[in-house]
Amino acid sequence: KEDCPRLVIASLLSEHESLDTIMHMIVAQNIGWDLTYIGNGVPHDEITFAASKVKAQVVVLAINNPRDIARKIYEIKHIRDKAHKTEDIILIGSQSNDYKQLSNDFNINISNDLTSFRLSLERLYSLIR
C-alpha cells in the first residue's frame, strides 16, 4: 500500500499482549492505514528504528501493565525525542490514562477506547492525505 499512511504498533518492555491491542490493529486497518506490528516487549530503540524504516507517520504504543511507570516514561520520552516531527504518538491500553501528564508535556495522544482511537486515526488520516 504505497499511497496509504503508515503506522507502527508495539508494546514496550515488560508489557504483555492483550486482545485490546489486536482490536486496535483491526480498527487501524479498516480505516485504511498500512500497519506494521512489531510485537510486545520491544525495546524503545527498536520501535524508533522500525518507525523510521517504514516511514511511519504514527507510532502506537500499547500500555497494559501498571508496573515500571518510570522506565516507561523514559522510553516514551526517548521515542518522542527520536521521532520525526511528522510522527504522532498514540498511547492505547488499560494503563494509558496513567500517562496524562506526559501527554500534555510532550504532545502525545491518549486513546482510552476504540472509538477515540478511531477518531484520532481518522483525523490524522485526513491531515496526511
Placement of each model-derived feature along the sequence:
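General small-molecule cofactor/ligand-binding pocket signal
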Residues: 36-38, 90, 109-111
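Conserved binding/catalytic microenvironments
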Residues: 1-71, 75, 82
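Peripheral docking tails and interdomain loops at the edges
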Residues: 94-129
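Short beta-strand elements of ligand-binding domains
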Residues: 87-94
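A cross-taxonomic marker for long C-terminal extensions/tails that follow the last structured domain
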Residues: 80-82, 86, 129
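Short, structured coil segments at secondary-structure junctions
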Residues: 31, 85, 103-107
